[in-house]
């Protein structure tokens, strides 16, 4: 059938093909021990559809027994409108989240609330992340990297301080959680240091 045929322009056929290909690639990634990164939350560009980035749309994939060996990372932890969905999805055994992009889009104070919510649910599944790209001609990725790293660390400190102040964790546990978010969780997920 020619590529330009009307059959390939049918949304239902394209959707079925996309679903098949995604699940095939996800299964192979699991077999190879490679986490699958899925963009969730806000995005840029006229091609972007906000409702398509709701992580709750992944629930059938995340519940698929054939994909249990595949780890999924919800990039941006649902940034903005969908962060609460990401929190709930972390209860799945093979789902992780990073809070990248939120470091750039929202204030450090608001980010600290998001980080605290994530830590109170499943701290062993939360990872630091940035979202480095040249946003404007005036600001390059180096500046964005510095800024997002600073805001991430400050938000993490505010979240952990609040948890200590509220009696949820000790200072020792706060230090442990900080190390987990900034290093250990990613090292475990990606197998850093294993040979």
In which residue ranges do the predicted regions lie?
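Active-site gating loops and adjacent loop-to-helix segments of metal-dependent hydrolytic enzymes
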Residues: 1-11, 152-160
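Catalytic pocket-lining loop regions of alpha/beta-barrel enzymes
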Residues: 3-128, 136-138
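Active-site glycine-centered loops adjacent to acidic/histidine catalytic or metal-binding residues
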Residues: 131
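Mid-to-C-terminal alpha-helical segments outside catalytic/metal-binding sites
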Residues: 123-125, 141-195
């Amino acid at each position: 059938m020619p590529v330009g045929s009307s059959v390939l322009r049918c949304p239902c056929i394209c959707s079925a093909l996309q679903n098949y290909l995604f699940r095939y690639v996800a299964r192979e990634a699991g077999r190879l021990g490679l986490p699958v990164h899925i963009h969730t939350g806000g995005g840029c560009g006229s091609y972007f559809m906000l409702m398509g980035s709701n992580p709750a749309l992944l629930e059938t994939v995340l519940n698929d027994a054939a994909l249990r060996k595949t780890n999924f990372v919800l990039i941006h932890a649902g940034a903005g409108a969908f962060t609460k969905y990401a929190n709930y999805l972390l209860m799945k055994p093979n789902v992780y989240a990073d809070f990248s992009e939120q470091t750039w889009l929202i204030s450090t104070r608001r980010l600290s609330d998001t980080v605290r919510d994530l830590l109170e649910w499943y701290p062993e599944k939360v990872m630091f992340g940035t979202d480095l790209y040249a946003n404007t001609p005036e600001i390059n990725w180096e500046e964005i990297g510095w800024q997002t790293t600073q805001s991430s660390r400050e938000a993490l400190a505010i979240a952990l301080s609040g948890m200590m102040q509220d009696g949820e964790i000790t200072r020792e546990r706060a230090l442990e959680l900080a190390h987990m978010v900034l290093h250990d969780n990613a090292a475990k997920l990606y197998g850093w240091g294993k040979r």
